[in-house]
Amino acid sequence: STNGGIKKELILPENLDKYALKVKRGQTQSEDMRNLGAYIKDVISLNKDNYIICGPDEALSNRLNHVFEATTRKWNTKIIKQDELLGRNGRVIDSILSEHACEGMLEGYLLTGRHGFIHSYEAFVRIIDSMVSQHAKWIKMAKEIPWRKELSSLNILLTSHCWQQDHNGFTHQDPGFINHLLPKKSDTIRIYLPFDTNTLISTFDHISRTKNYINLVVASKHM
Protein backbone atom coordinates (compact mmCIF):
# COMPACT_ATOMS: atom_id res chain seq x y z
CA SER A 1 0.00 0.00 0.00
CA THR A 2 2.86 2.42 0.74
CA ASN A 3 4.03 2.33 -2.87
CA GLY A 4 0.89 3.83 -4.34
CA GLY A 5 -1.00 0.60 -3.72
CA ILE A 6 -4.44 2.19 -3.64
CA LYS A 7 -3.64 4.81 -6.21
CA LYS A 8 -6.56 6.71 -7.71
CA GLU A 9 -5.95 9.51 -10.15
CA LEU A 10 -6.91 12.96 -8.92
CA ILE A 11 -9.77 14.58 -10.81
CA LEU A 12 -9.53 18.37 -10.97
CA PRO A 13 -12.04 20.97 -12.20
CA GLU A 14 -11.68 21.59 -15.92
CA ASN A 15 -12.60 25.25 -16.19
CA LEU A 16 -10.58 27.57 -13.94
CA ASP A 17 -12.39 30.60 -15.35
CA LYS A 18 -15.38 29.52 -13.27
CA TYR A 19 -13.47 30.45 -10.11
CA ALA A 20 -11.81 33.62 -11.37
CA LEU A 21 -12.49 36.82 -9.48
CA LYS A 22 -13.65 39.60 -11.77
CA VAL A 23 -11.85 42.67 -10.49
CA LYS A 24 -12.78 46.32 -10.80
CA ARG A 25 -9.77 48.41 -9.94
CA GLY A 26 -10.14 50.25 -6.67
CA GLN A 27 -13.55 48.70 -6.00
CA THR A 28 -13.26 44.93 -5.52
CA GLN A 29 -12.72 43.57 -2.01
CA SER A 30 -12.37 39.85 -1.46
CA GLU A 31 -10.46 37.20 0.51
CA ASP A 32 -8.06 35.02 -1.48
CA MET A 33 -8.33 31.95 0.74
CA ARG A 34 -12.13 32.09 0.85
CA ASN A 35 -12.23 32.14 -2.95
CA LEU A 36 -9.76 29.26 -3.12
CA GLY A 37 -12.12 27.33 -0.86
CA ALA A 38 -14.74 27.32 -3.62
CA TYR A 39 -12.26 25.58 -5.93
CA ILE A 40 -11.22 23.07 -3.24
CA LYS A 41 -14.90 22.35 -2.50
CA ASP A 42 -15.26 21.09 -6.06
CA VAL A 43 -12.03 19.07 -5.82
CA ILE A 44 -13.55 17.33 -2.78
CA SER A 45 -16.79 16.67 -4.67
CA LEU A 46 -14.86 15.10 -7.55
CA ASN A 47 -12.68 12.95 -5.27
CA LYS A 48 -14.94 11.83 -2.44
CA ASP A 49 -12.82 8.89 -1.31
CA ASN A 50 -9.25 9.80 -2.24
CA TYR A 51 -8.61 13.36 -1.04
CA ILE A 52 -8.08 14.83 2.44
CA ILE A 53 -7.40 18.24 3.93
CA CYS A 54 -5.21 18.25 7.04
CA GLY A 55 -4.76 21.13 9.47
CA PRO A 56 -4.67 21.80 13.22
CA ASP A 57 -8.17 23.25 13.79
CA GLU A 58 -7.68 26.09 11.32
CA ALA A 59 -9.95 25.40 8.33
CA LEU A 60 -12.44 28.14 9.19
CA SER A 61 -9.78 30.52 10.43
CA ASN A 62 -7.98 30.03 7.13
CA ARG A 63 -11.21 30.92 5.32
CA LEU A 64 -11.81 27.49 3.78
CA ASN A 65 -15.50 27.84 4.64
CA HIS A 66 -16.77 26.72 1.23
CA VAL A 67 -15.16 23.31 1.72
CA PHE A 68 -17.82 22.50 4.33
CA GLU A 69 -20.51 22.78 1.68
CA ALA A 70 -19.14 19.51 0.28
CA THR A 71 -17.85 17.65 3.34
CA THR A 72 -17.36 17.71 7.11
CA ARG A 73 -14.62 17.27 9.64
CA LYS A 74 -13.69 13.61 10.10
CA TRP A 75 -14.90 12.37 13.51
CA ASN A 76 -15.10 8.72 14.59
CA THR A 77 -16.49 8.99 18.12
CA LYS A 78 -19.73 10.30 19.60
CA ILE A 79 -21.21 13.42 18.04
CA ILE A 80 -23.33 15.71 20.22
CA LYS A 81 -25.62 18.52 19.11
CA GLN A 82 -23.13 21.22 20.09
CA ASP A 83 -20.51 19.80 17.73
CA GLU A 84 -19.88 21.75 14.56
CA LEU A 85 -19.42 20.28 11.09
CA LEU A 86 -18.50 16.75 12.22
CA GLY A 87 -19.20 13.54 10.33
CA ARG A 88 -18.06 9.94 10.00
CA ASN A 89 -16.95 10.33 6.39
CA GLY A 90 -15.57 13.88 6.50
CA ARG A 91 -12.55 14.70 4.36
CA VAL A 92 -11.22 17.44 6.67
CA ILE A 93 -8.78 16.24 9.34
CA ASP A 94 -9.19 19.31 11.51
CA SER A 95 -10.04 18.20 15.04
CA ILE A 96 -6.55 17.63 16.40
CA LEU A 97 -4.26 20.42 17.57
CA SER A 98 -1.04 18.86 16.34
CA GLU A 99 0.85 19.91 13.24
CA HIS A 100 2.98 16.78 13.70
CA ALA A 101 0.00 14.43 13.59
CA CYS A 102 -1.61 16.23 10.66
CA GLU A 103 1.55 16.21 8.56
CA GLY A 104 2.24 12.58 9.41
CA MET A 105 -1.28 11.51 8.45
CA LEU A 106 -1.01 13.35 5.15
CA GLU A 107 2.37 11.78 4.35
CA GLY A 108 0.98 8.32 4.98
CA TYR A 109 -2.08 9.05 2.86
CA LEU A 110 0.07 10.25 -0.04
CA LEU A 111 2.23 7.13 0.14
CA THR A 112 -0.83 5.02 -0.64
CA GLY A 113 -1.27 6.91 -3.91
CA ARG A 114 -4.02 9.26 -2.79
CA HIS A 115 -4.07 13.05 -2.55
CA GLY A 116 -4.47 16.04 -0.25
CA PHE A 117 -2.76 19.00 1.38
CA ILE A 118 -1.93 20.45 4.77
CA HIS A 119 -2.66 24.05 5.73
CA SER A 120 -1.55 26.10 8.70
CA TYR A 121 -0.30 29.52 9.73
CA GLU A 122 3.10 30.59 8.44
CA ALA A 123 4.48 30.93 11.96
CA PHE A 124 3.07 27.68 13.37
CA VAL A 125 4.30 25.40 10.58
CA ARG A 126 7.85 25.64 11.95
CA ILE A 127 6.87 22.76 14.22
CA ILE A 128 7.16 20.33 11.29
CA ASP A 129 10.47 21.60 9.87
CA SER A 130 12.31 18.34 10.43
CA MET A 131 9.42 16.18 9.19
CA VAL A 132 9.34 18.01 5.87
CA SER A 133 13.13 17.70 5.56
CA GLN A 134 12.87 13.95 6.00
CA HIS A 135 10.14 13.76 3.37
CA ALA A 136 12.36 15.73 0.97
CA LYS A 137 15.11 13.17 1.52
CA TRP A 138 12.61 10.35 0.98
CA ILE A 139 11.51 11.87 -2.35
CA LYS A 140 15.13 12.18 -3.48
CA MET A 141 15.91 8.55 -2.65
CA ALA A 142 12.63 7.26 -4.09
CA LYS A 143 13.44 8.85 -7.46
CA GLU A 144 16.62 6.75 -7.58
CA ILE A 145 14.77 3.46 -7.04
CA PRO A 146 13.23 2.14 -10.29
CA TRP A 147 10.31 0.29 -8.73
CA ARG A 148 9.15 3.27 -6.67
CA LYS A 149 5.99 4.78 -8.18
CA GLU A 150 5.47 8.51 -8.57
CA LEU A 151 3.25 9.91 -5.83
CA SER A 152 1.32 13.13 -5.38
CA SER A 153 3.37 16.00 -4.07
CA LEU A 154 3.32 17.06 -0.43
CA ASN A 155 1.43 20.35 -0.77
CA ILE A 156 1.67 22.85 2.09
CA LEU A 157 -0.64 25.88 2.11
CA LEU A 158 0.24 28.61 4.60
CA THR A 159 -1.52 31.83 5.46
CA SER A 160 0.50 34.91 6.32
CA HIS A 161 -0.54 37.64 8.73
CA CYS A 162 1.93 40.19 7.42
CA TRP A 163 -0.88 42.45 6.23
CA GLN A 164 -2.49 42.76 9.68
CA GLN A 165 0.14 43.77 12.21
CA ASP A 166 -2.34 44.67 14.92
CA HIS A 167 -3.75 41.13 15.10
CA ASN A 168 -1.34 38.56 16.55
CA GLY A 169 1.50 40.22 14.67
CA PHE A 170 4.16 39.41 17.24
CA THR A 171 3.49 35.67 17.35
CA HIS A 172 2.14 34.97 13.89
CA GLN A 173 4.84 36.43 11.66
CA ASP A 174 7.73 34.12 10.95
CA PRO A 175 8.85 33.50 7.37
CA GLY A 176 11.38 30.98 8.66
CA PHE A 177 9.75 28.01 6.93
CA ILE A 178 10.62 29.52 3.55
CA ASN A 179 14.20 29.95 4.76
CA HIS A 180 14.16 26.32 5.86
CA LEU A 181 13.16 25.08 2.39
CA LEU A 182 15.16 27.43 0.16
CA PRO A 183 18.55 25.68 0.58
CA LYS A 184 17.12 22.37 -0.57
CA LYS A 185 17.36 21.08 -4.14
CA SER A 186 15.06 22.64 -6.72
CA ASP A 187 14.17 19.25 -8.20
CA THR A 188 12.33 18.53 -4.95
CA ILE A 189 11.21 21.89 -3.52
CA ARG A 190 9.00 24.56 -5.06
CA ILE A 191 7.89 27.79 -3.35
CA TYR A 192 5.00 29.93 -4.59
CA LEU A 193 3.87 33.38 -3.40
CA PRO A 194 0.61 34.13 -5.25
CA PHE A 195 -0.41 37.75 -4.82
CA ASP A 196 -4.18 37.62 -5.39
CA THR A 197 -7.16 35.29 -5.71
CA ASN A 198 -6.66 34.36 -9.34
CA THR A 199 -2.95 33.59 -9.06
CA LEU A 200 -3.65 31.57 -5.90
CA ILE A 201 -6.29 29.39 -7.56
CA SER A 202 -4.09 28.88 -10.62
CA THR A 203 -1.12 28.03 -8.40
CA PHE A 204 -3.10 25.54 -6.34
CA ASP A 205 -4.42 23.87 -9.48
CA HIS A 206 -0.84 23.58 -10.77
CA ILE A 207 0.68 22.08 -7.63
CA SER A 208 -2.20 19.60 -7.38
CA ARG A 209 -1.09 18.14 -10.71
CA THR A 210 2.58 17.66 -9.74
CA LYS A 211 4.29 14.48 -8.55
CA ASN A 212 7.24 13.91 -6.22
CA TYR A 213 7.61 17.51 -5.03
CA ILE A 214 7.18 19.44 -1.85
CA ASN A 215 5.19 22.52 -2.86
CA LEU A 216 4.91 25.46 -0.48
CA VAL A 217 2.29 28.14 -1.10
CA VAL A 218 2.07 31.21 1.13
CA ALA A 219 -1.11 33.25 0.69
CA SER A 220 -3.08 36.02 2.34
CA LYS A 221 -6.38 35.29 4.04
CA HIS A 222 -7.28 38.90 4.77
CA MET A 223 -9.35 41.26 2.68
Q: Where do the language-model regions lie?
A:
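Thiamine diphosphate
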Residues: S1-M223
